[in-house]
Amino acid sequence: MSITVNQIVLHQLVKNMDGDSIKMESVLRDELLSITPEVEQMMLQLHQGYQNKAKAFGVFQEKSIFAQHLNRLLEQEIEFLGFSQYSTKLLADELGKYNFAESGTLILCQYNFLATDYLFIALLDSRHSMLVDEHLDIRRTEYLDITQFDIAARINLTDLQVNANSNRYLTFIKGRVGRKISDFFMDFLGAEEGLNPQVQNQCLLQAVSDYCDQGELNKEQTQAVKKQVFEYCKGQLSNGNNIELRELSDSLPTLNEQPFVVFTEEQNYGLEESIPPIRSTLKSLTKFSGSGKGVTLSFDAELLNTRIQWDPMTDTLTIKGLPPNLKDQLQKALQSEN
């Protein structure tokens, strides 16, 4: 699938030391980039890379300066270039407050994908490498790293304009180096956390468990329902889709003459109609897993009290019938000791 790039520009943030303090300077383009096949290919790669990142959701705060200028852009009161230049200066001021600030190239792009308009913002690093020129000489070169980036956000402009009460129109990358990366970018955007997918997934799992309990299902029936939920969610995850609560409900058996979606509404679980799936959380529908003190365990939930017995009094698990590869390793270890 391709994307349609409408407007795109690059600016630079340059780190300078002013005594003991950091000062970020803005180097601004005075015109937008021409939309060439190379530019479209770059944005497609950035779009695909962003899709695969772990993201959190956010919403603009009431006094967000960035949101005010974005609204002026959407109302066509200002041009995209002026908006991008102001945003770059705003980010430079915010980034200068942190000692981890580094130089980078800021990209702002307004594009369309699957009938949805987006504004993509990312701070990209430059990398050094070598190239062979036309004379077969080795020269140093510098390139924009569009495969590895941790500082980025995307605004669903269509959702923002159509649904004023949305809590998921803004997404940003959850940085691996700690909250500080996410925090400064959220401060720059004037945003706060919106939808929490982790909480939504956990509430969904609890609702499924409670639904089975109130339906007075036995262990086997409960496991069958949970497996059905997991298979649906796994399918949505594989296709890049959200969990649609009503669609999920329609696929499940009706218990006590009450559909699952009605049960969740009456019990006030606070579930959204559409929930971003989280694989690690959903796995607990059909598996038990855990790790600690050098031990990692994972097994199908249906094996509990059959092949696997748990004694809470002695805090022990008894496994009947070890996996062949594990048994083989243990036998080899025993032989080497003897």
UniProtKB/Swiss-Prot annotation:
| Record-level GO cellular component terms | bacterial nucleoid; cytoplasm
Disulphide-bridged cysteine pairs: none
Q: Which domain of life is it from?
A: Bacteria
Alphabetically sorted, this entry's keywords are:
Cytoplasm
GO MF annotations for this entry?
Answer: double-stranded DNA binding; single-stranded RNA binding
Q: Which InterPro entries match?
A: Nucleoid_associated_NdpA
**Compartments reported by the entry:** Cytoplasm, Nucleoid
In its keyword annotation, does this UniProt entry include Magnesium? no
State whether keyword Manganese applies.
no
Q: Which PANTHER family does the record match to this protein?
A: NUCLEOID-ASSOCIATED PROTEIN YEJK, PTHR38772
Which protein family is named in the record?
Belongs to the YejK family.
Which NCBIfam families does the record associate with it? Answer: PRK00378.1
Q: What is this protein called?
A: Nucleoid-associated protein CGSHiEE_07855
Per the UniProt record, the source organism is Haemophilus influenzae (strain PittEE)
